[in-house]
């Protein structure tokens, strides 16, 4: 996926989950943050960031904060909408006969439903932006929705669907994602139960470009 236009900035602070103050060309701008997660280990004062320039003149904010430079790691794409977009592009190249985003299964909306021949597939997508000592972790904040989705996938797997949870690693040099049990042990338990039921765990490694994010490798978890 590609962004329309990118500007460079320096992160100042984040008054709330939705906005941040960023210095752009010597002036402090209020920008929209495309990730409501905490991201405390990423958004440090003085850190270099990348902003997508909005083409909507009616918007209150001119910029969206989409990437941040993490010391010792490199650029991290922190756009929470990016994982589903890149997976949609990636799935289109995987030979499925039919792909439907935002598929209702049970009481959940699963990110993707696919068909290939007679086989039906479900895939839930999780974006990973948290790195500690060279390992990716998910979630960075408790997610009851994420736990619920894993239970739904395990149930669907038992009913004949081929199910997968795909972790999109939104940074380079990281090849695996582990459940962040210190933040939410329930997610780790649900992931283990889903794997035991036959749900596939995928790590999707990405190239983080200046104005793009692209899946370049798939690994089994």
Regions found by a protein language model. Name each.
Residues 40, 72-101:
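Acidic-basic catalytic patches of nuclease active cores, encompassing PD-(D/E)XK
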Residues 37-50, 154:
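Short nucleic-acid-contacting surface segments enriched for D/E, G, S/T with interspersed K/R
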Residues 134-144, 154-183, 205:
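Nucleic-acid nuclease catalytic cores
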Residues 170-221:
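Domain-level recognition of nuclease-like catalytic cores that cleave nucleotide substrates
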Residues 9, 110-140, 153:
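Conserved catalytic cores of phosphodiester-cleaving nucleases, focusing on short active-site segments
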Residues 44-56, 205-206:
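Flexible glycine-rich surface loops and low-complexity tracts that mediate binding to linear polymers
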Residues 16-21:
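Short aromatic-glycine-enriched beta-strand elements
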Residues 27-41:
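Beta-strand/loop nucleic-acid-binding surfaces
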């Amino acid at each position: 996926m590609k962004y329309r236009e990118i500007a460079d900035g320096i992160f100042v602070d984040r008054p709330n989950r939705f906005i941040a103050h960023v210095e752009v060309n010597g002036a402090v701008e209020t920008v929209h943050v495309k990730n409501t997660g905490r991201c405390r280990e990423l958004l440090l004062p003085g850190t270099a960031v990348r902003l997508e320039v909005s083409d909507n003149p009616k918007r209150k904010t001119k910029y969206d904060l989409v990437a941040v430079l993490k010391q010792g790691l490199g650029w991290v794409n922190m756009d929470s909408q990016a994982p589903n977009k890149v997976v949609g592009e990636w799935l289109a190249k995987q030979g499925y006969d039919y792909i439907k985003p935002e598929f209702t299964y049970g009481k959940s909306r699963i990110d993707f439903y696919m068909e290939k021949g007679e086989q039906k597939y479900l895939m839930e997508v999780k974006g990973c932006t948290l790195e500690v000592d060279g390992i990716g972790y998910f979630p960075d904040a408790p997610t009851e929705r994420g736990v619920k989705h894993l239970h739904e996938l395990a149930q669907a797997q038992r009913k004949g669907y081929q199910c997968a949870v795909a972790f999109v690693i939104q940074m380079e040099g990281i090849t695996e994602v582990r459940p962040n049990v210190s933040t939410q042990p329930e997610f780790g338990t649900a992931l283990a139960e889903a794997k035991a039921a036959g749900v596939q765990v995928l790590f999707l490694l990405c190239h983080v470009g200046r104005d793009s994010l692209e899946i370049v490798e798939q690994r089994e978890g």
